[in-house]
Structure formats: structure tokens, C-alpha cells
Amino acid sequence: MTPHRLQTMVQRGEPIRERSCKGWRLDGMDLSGGVFIEVDFDGVSCIGTRFEESQFERCTLGGVRLNDAQLKKAAFSQCALTSADLTAAVLDDAVFHRCKLPGSDFSQASVVDTKFMESTLSRSRFAGGLLDRTLFFQSPLDGADLSGTRLDKAVFYQVDLRTTALGGARFERVVFVESRLGGHDFSRHHFLLCQFTDADLEGCNFEGAHMAQCNFKGARLRDAVLRGVHAPQALFPEADLSGTDARGAHFDQSLWIEAVLAGTDFGGASMQQCIFHRADCTGTSFAGTDLTYADFSEAMLAGANLDARLFRTQLHGARDVPDALRGNAGVLPNDPDLFEAQRWSAHRTRHPTPFTKGETQ
């Protein structure tokens, strides 16, 4: 088998099976649409090679040079690409499924709509690249370098990023689902419409960060630093911010339904029109906080410091309301109409009205 023979077979649509190309030079060749099964590409030079829509199954590509290679819509399944060089390669719409890519270099590569599924990416490098709509599904990135990358609509599902370098990265509409980012320093970072659903952010430093309209549903932010963050209209339902320092932050119109805020310090923060329904505010400090039109309906307020700016602040059904707030002109203690609506709703649930076909309820 020679490089020329290989190209001829690919052009004829013949699959390449159990061949060794070890040490070959395939620079600049057009191998688009090739099907490679258990082929040994270790150490092969494929600089500028065209592999569009090619398929690689159980191939070894250790140390392969794919600089500037065209790999659009290529598919890799159960392949080993240890220390592969993919700098400046085009990987748009490519798929890596159950591949081993430790130490691989994707610097300056175009990684648009690329999918990494259950693949190992430890110590890999994406520095300075574009990750646009890229999916990392259960693909470890421990020790990887994503510093200076632009992440736009990228998705990380159950990925451990605690030891991943993220300095200088740009986050736009990025989604982190059940991923771990604990301990990272994100101070003064900009997060545009990002989602951290059920993510582990324990101990992260977000001081001065911009997080307007970001979603932290179910996220763990224990002992995190949120001092001076700009996060209006952010969502924190069911999030755990126990012991978090959020002094001087801007959270106007943000949502905290059923959030755990025990021991959180919101001193001097702006929290106008925030919703704290059923939130655990045990020992929470709102000293000097602007709580104009905030709603603490059914929240737990045991030991909370509410020496704050209060104006039409709702405490409907709140538990353990501090005595100092009783009779405060800025507080709306209960809403009689809402109480009646809740009573009626509970009664209707216990005694539903029979519904007959042809009738309306």
C-alpha cells in the first residue's frame, strides 16, 4: 500500500481496513469521504489534508499531524488520538465518540457544532480557538487549556472543569449542566445569558462579574464570592448560596424561589423586586439592602437581619418574621385576598368538582 494507492481506493469508495500508514506523509491530499476501519495512522503527517465527511472507526492516530486539515463532518468512533496536532484545523460538525484525545492540540481550530461524546480530553489545548455550539458530553477536561477561547452557545454536560484553565475565556450563551467548576476565579468575567443548571460552583470567585439574566437553577454556590456582581434578572431557583458573600451586588428583579440562603451576606446589595418565595433566609443578612417591592412570601426568616430599605416589601405567610418588622410602614405583612385564594385552591384540590362531558368548569 502506498499513499497514491490509498487515495485511489478512497476515491473509488472502497473502505480501508486494518492497514498501517505509520509514518507516512499525506500532506495536502484529498481523502474526503474515506472510510477507515482499524487503520494505524500513528505519526502520520496530514498537514492540510482533506478529510471532509470521512469516517474513522477504531483507528490509532497517536501524534498525527492534522494542522490546517479539513475535517468538516468527519466522524471518529473509538479512536485513539493521543497528542494529536489539530492546530488551525476545521472541525465543523465533526463528531468524536468514545475517543481518547489526551494532550491533543486544538489551538486556533474552528470547532463549530463539533461534538465530543464520552471522550477523554485531559490536558488538551483549545487556547485562542472558537467553540461555537460545541458539545462536550461526559468528556473529561481535567488539566485542559481553554484560556482565551471564545465560547458561544457551547454546552458542557456532566463535565468536570475544576482543573481546566479558563482564564480570559469569553462566555456567551454557554450552558453548563451538572458540571463542576468549583474553585475557579471568574472575577470581572462577562457571562452573557449563560446557564449553570445544577452546576457545582462552590467556592468560585465572581467578584465584579457581569451575569445579567444568567440562570443558576439548582446550582451549588456555597461559600462563593459574589461581591459587586452585576446580575439583574438572574435566576437562582433552588440554588444553594449558603455562606456566600454577595455584598454590594446588583440583583434587581432576580428570582430566588426555594433558594437556600442561610448565612448569606447581601449587605448593601440592590435587590428591588426580587422574589424569595419559600426561600430559606435563616441568618441571612440584608443589612442596608434595597428590598423595595421584594417578595418574601412563605420564606423562612429566622435570625435574618432585615435592617434594610423596605417599601411595599411583601412578607405574606413568611415564617419567623423578626419582631422589629411588625408594624413597619414599609412592609406588607399579609395579603388577605391571596390568603383567600390559597384557601379556596386547597379546598378545591381536596374536593374536586366532578366534571361531566359537555359541561365546562
Model-derived features with residue positions:
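Tandem repeat scaffolds
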Residues: 1-361
